[in-house]
Every structure is written in C-alpha cells, then in structure tokens.
Swiss-Prot record:
Mg(2+) binds at residues 74, 147, 150. It catalyses: Endonucleolytic cleavage to 5'-phosphomonoester. This is Ribonuclease 3. GO terms for molecular function: double-stranded RNA binding; metal ion binding; ribonuclease III activity; rRNA binding.
C-alpha cells in the first residue's frame, strides 16, 4: 500500500496551498516543521501526516484515496496528554486533593487551552484540509486546533515513546508562560514572596541552585532563596521551578512567623533582613 505521505505529496492542492494565512506568514515545508519539533531527528512522516489530516480530507472528492483522518490519533493523544499532565500535577502538589488536582488538569487539558498551545506551534497552517472545505475557518477553529494538538501528541507517543512525548509536553505546555497561571492562583508562593519584599522595601529574592542529584532524566534540584544575603528557605523537587516554589513557600512561612513573633532560629524578621 502506498504511504499516505506519498499520496498527499502527489495531490495538486498539497503543493499549491495558499502562501499565507491570517497572521501566520508563509507556511514552511510540512516536513521541516515536523523535523523541527525534534531537532532534526529521523521521524515517521506517515504518522505525522495522518496527525495533521483533517476529517474533511476523507470526504474530499478530489482525493478519494485518502481514507484516514487524525481522529484516531486524537483519541489516543487525549489519553496520553491526560496521563502526563496528571503525573506532573501529582508530583508537583503532594498535598493536593483529588478535587484540586482535577481542577488544575481541567484548566490545562481543555479545548481553549490546547488550541492556544497549538497556535504557539502555528499548527493551523500545517493542517491538511479538504479542498472544498472552509479552509480559513477550519485552520483557526479552536476545536480543530485542540484536536490537532492531541493527534500530534498521539503520533509522538507511537513514534517516539513516552519519554519523548513527555519532553514535548514539558516544552510546549508546562514550560509555557500560560501554564503557571493555570496552576498557581493562591499557590504562587514566588509571587507572594516578591510582593512581601517589595512591601518592606527589600531587594528582590535570589534563587540559588545548591545541588543537582540523580540521572540526567531524573535529576533532583535543591534550591535556596535568600534576600539581602540572608537565607529564607529552600526546596527540593524534580524541576527547578517546583523547587523554587517550595523554597518560596518555606520562606513565606518563616517570614509570617517572624511577623507574629514566633521567630525561628536563623530566620530574621523582614526589617532585620534589610540591614547590612
């Protein structure tokens, strides 16, 4: 059976897609786009072409040989994405209740959020859509983009395995600026610590990595936070951001105790912290 990739490449519309889409500029080669996700490593183009094939292609009379869309990969990717995000939240919030973790996950794994991550990748311009379909509407549709992101996740899992798809999710979701807003709210101890130091006219907190232990893919980071040269707290976690949050949480606890008179040893009150 001829690979889907070859079939798509031979279609007239595939080589003559519009040169630009609203706000996206000229789309690069689909092959180059896929390879760019993994720093040029060899990939199964067949699998990724399927992940980016919209269901309208299956019904396109100009391409009767195309019988598969990305819907099955979307189904798989939804589960893989849910697993990786659930595992991350479980580790990041060891005291979080089932309800709290579910609430965080719902903010991350939903159509609107996933469509935003898809837009960051310019996924819309790479979708393979039926010639008779409303291409511009489909390429910018929230549900279509979310589905494509899930399908891409499923393709990465089948092609590269769990570690590779976890790395992809970390880069595209967990390390994105929008992610912290989804899981932080009142638990953003770093923001609380900054607000506290500013209100007492102190220098901003400084985070220092004290140690990195373990294998490359399972490192544990210990980070210390200080202000004006005085240690305020430290935290240990599998990710630097999480260790910083734990250090800031400990620092806030110490500072709050200092303000109420319950001062722990080696933890000065804010006024004392600012002295030379």
């Amino acid at each position: 059976m001829e690979p889907l990739w070859h079939k798509l490449s031979a279609l007239p519309f595939f080589s003559s897609r519009p040169e630009k889409w609203e706000g996206s500029g000229a789309p690069p080669s689909l092959t180059a786009f896929i390879r760019s996700l993994f720093k040029g490593k060899a990939l199964s183009l067949e699998l990724y072409a399927t992940a980016l094939t919209h269901r309208s292609m299956v019904h396109d009379t100009t391409a009767p040989e195309i019988t598969r869309s990305n819907q099955r990969l979307e189904f798989l990717g939804d589960s893989v994405l849910g697993l990786i995000i659930s595992e991350y939240l479980y580790r990041r919030f060891p005291e979080g209740t089932e309800g709290e973790l579910s609430s965080y996950r719902a903010k991350i794994v939903n159509g609107k959020s996933l469509a935003g991550f898809a837009r960051n990748l310019d996924l819309g311009i790479h979708l393979i859509i039926g010639e008779s379909a409303d291409q511009q509407r489909i390429r910018t549709s929230t549900s279509t983009l979310a589905d494509a992101f899930e399908a891409l996740t499923g393709a990465i899992y089948l092609d590269r395995g769990l570690d590779a798809v976890r790395e992809f999710i970390e880069e595209q979701i967990i390390d994105s600026p929008a992610f912290e807003a989804m899981v932080s709210t009142e638990n953003n101890h770093k923001s609380r610590l900054i607000e506290h130091t500013q209100s007492h006219q102190l220098p901003p907190p400084v985070y220092t990595v004290l140690s990195e232990e373990g294998a490359e893919h399972e490192k544990t980071f210990t980070i210390e936070v200080s202000c004006n040269g005085r240690r305020l707290g430290r935290g240990t976690a599998l990710r630097k951001k999480d260790a910083e949050q734990l250090a800031a949480e400990e620092a806030m606890g110490a500072l709050e105790r200092a303000l109420t008179g319950d001062v722990a040893e080696d933890t000065p009150a804010p006024e004392e912290t600012g002295r030379g």
